[in-house]
Amino acid sequence: MSLTINHQTNDISNSTGTITINGVAVGGDNTPIIWSGNRGLFGGGDTGSASNVIDYVTIATTGNATDFGDLTVARHSPAACSDGIYGLFGGGFIPADPTGSATNVIDYVTIATLANATDFGDLTVAQYGPAACSNGTYGLFGGGLDGSAINVINYVTIATTGNATDFGDLTAARYGLAACSNGTYGLFGGGWGGSNSNIIDYVTISTTGNATDFGDLTAARRFLASCSDVTYGIFGGGNTGSNSNIIDYVTISTTGNATDFGDLTVVKYGPAACSDLTYGIFGGGSTSNVIDYVTIATPANATDFGDLTVARTSPAACSGD
């Protein structure tokens, strides 16, 4: 069996899991796995009040974000993932008198088309501050707060609107965590479950079941963000007791503790992150409009990318084409 990518034919007859050919992740069924793309979207957040703003950037080109459209309901602390075509924004917190509430709303957009979001379906439970990742087919939403921290993982088929289904449980209940994937494994790191957590869990995205311990972040923290390429997952920002500019990384296919990657340009509580599988961008956080970027395969400090259209804390981000 062979597969041609970028005009190069490659023998993959003996491949299992995810392999990489010319920067493209390829699954065991010999098809490209796409969970990201060139356009990065940032949706929702807290500007002092809840925001419904979605803005976008071209990840390979530094510059300020442009308006994309609006979420169906203004909220902060949702989570987002994509299949490279559709972007989903699920969960979050809708402030309202007197205390507000977590939500189970899932919205979707077609990433290539500027427009307002449309209702997709509902999570199995309301989730404030969940994290999300994808393998290009299934989108997982894990953790969150619904009165108390929860360990629930839900999943949806991204290309098919409908309500989420139970996937399994995280190893520890927490919210304000972050997630990424390499197209096969999904990692959920950090969060708050009564104290800051350094836990990294992992799941095989195509197989329902409970998460397994992966290792530890370099610093326990909450409301951080994560993105990845096909090899490395990076976790940036968050609150360790004070707001942080920490970036650490792991090799997603190899369990173990995270290693220092570098620093964001500014401390960020509640940023959001996405990637084009080469560059990772971290936008917003600490009611800032700053977007930073890194080259995911090269540990180093982040560089200024540009600005969001609206400064805000705890948006969610995904990417596609």
Residue ranges, per PLM feature:
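Polar, enzyme-active/binding microenvironments
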Residues: 2-4, 10-321
